[in-house]
Amino acid sequence: MSIVWTNGTFDILHPGHIQLFKVARSLGDKVIVATDTDEKIKKDKGDYKPFNDLCYRVAMLEAIKYIDVVLTFGDRKELEGLIQLYSPCLLYTSDAADE
């Protein structure tokens, strides 16, 4: 089974995110999306973010038909551990979706 991985804040979902997930689905059998915790977003982007809390963002991501698994991470070490655990064949980013 080929696993495609992407991660990000996904705070305010927009059509570009949906396109990212749709293309990710076309590239593999399973799509895993990891999203930052609220604490990580505040640390990285300031106290005014995220607009939507983690529970809301996870629920929105879980409702998208192109996504199989939604995970959360609080720091880079945790993210790297999850990537190692799931061993995706492809790490897919929004930069790749623009190409």
Predicted regions and their residues:
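Short acidic amphipathic segments
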Residues: 58-76
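Conserved small/polar residues in nucleotide/adenosyl-binding loops
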Residues: 92-97
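N-terminal catalytic cores of NTP/NDP-binding nucleotidyl/phosphoryl-transfer enzymes
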Residues: 2-35
